[in-house]
Amino acid sequence: TLIGYNTLTIRKESQKYQELQQKYQNQPLDETTHSNANTPTIYCIGDSLTIGAKSSSYPTALSSATNFSVNKFGGAQDQTQDIAIRMGKIKIYTNNITIPETATPVNLKIYDKDNNVLNVLKGKGSNFTTVEIAGISGKLKYNATKKTHTFTRDQNGVEKVITKLTQIKSEIPTFEKNNVAIIFTGTYDPQTQNGIFKTITYQRAIINQLKTKNYIVVSLTSKRRLPIVDDMNKVLKEEHKEHFLDFRYYLLNDGIKDAKITLTAQDKKDLQKGYIPSSFLQVDMLNGNAKFNQLLAEQITKKMIDLKYIDKNDIK
């Protein structure tokens, strides 16, 4: 299973989520928490739009709707490159540091195998907090004020001088081939010219590491953050073909009807600008609320059936 966010956590969240859903869905709670032994585990891989907050996340809604085992993996502020690192596809290194005898933080830079400095792992996530460097276990942290990473060894020991590229290791997830991956990344990727192609490069790395053909890539959603989001999604669709789920298009069209919401004046202004209606979003106008997450879970379920990853009879 993927580390960091286990199935038990999702099960507990799922119950809270069902209670939350009752506020706008007059349906009885389904107390079932057992997953069918023959159904796949679903791995939801991404940033804050996947990790969610408290009891509201689309993986929680997905678990509630299908009764499948669901695992979350990633980090709230992760770029696609960060997730490729967390998955173990991209190895990271450090160099030219001295790890002291005591548990004193030491500044370090992170490099790739070609000695290029990487601007990565600035937020917390499923792994790469507890790490090992040159056989010494410790904690990797990012100081946003000083814009530097630090390594603090767990226990006092012998000083270690590092003068060559040395891998920073962490616990890496394993993935079973018959399971399903939902990849929802790119929202926090750098907004540079042709940046979407870097997103695709790292999404390819993630898919390659998963070693499965059973995956779905969710579209980018936020035009507020990504002004050319529709053009970016066209590129993603061309790359991922039938695996691509255009959730943004759905939200701007059928999602309003399916959610059974009455558009507010603000929602109508949002739609005129090509923005996701505020009624689907949290106060940050980026992350989805419970309605958003429920609709995404439903669209992913439909997509998994269309792609024959699951059978509709598998759903509770």
Language model segments and positions:
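Hydrophobic membrane-insertion alpha-helices, especially the h-region
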Residues: 1-6
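Catalytic nucleophile-elbow at a beta strand-turn-alpha helix junction centered on a G-D-S/GDSL motif
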Residues: 39-56, 76-80
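A short beta-strand-loop structural module common to alpha/beta enzyme folds
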Residues: 67-83
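Alpha-helical cap/lid subdomain in secreted, periplasmic
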Residues: 12, 19, 59-65, 88-103, ...
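Structural signal for conserved beta-strand scaffold positions within catalytic alpha/beta enzyme cores
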Residues: 44, 72-74, 245-249
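Hydrophobic/aromatic residues located in beta-strands of well-ordered beta-sheets
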Residues: 42, 70, 215-216
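Ligand-binding grooves and catalytic loops that recognize ribose/phosphate and carbohydrate rings
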Residues: 16, 82-87
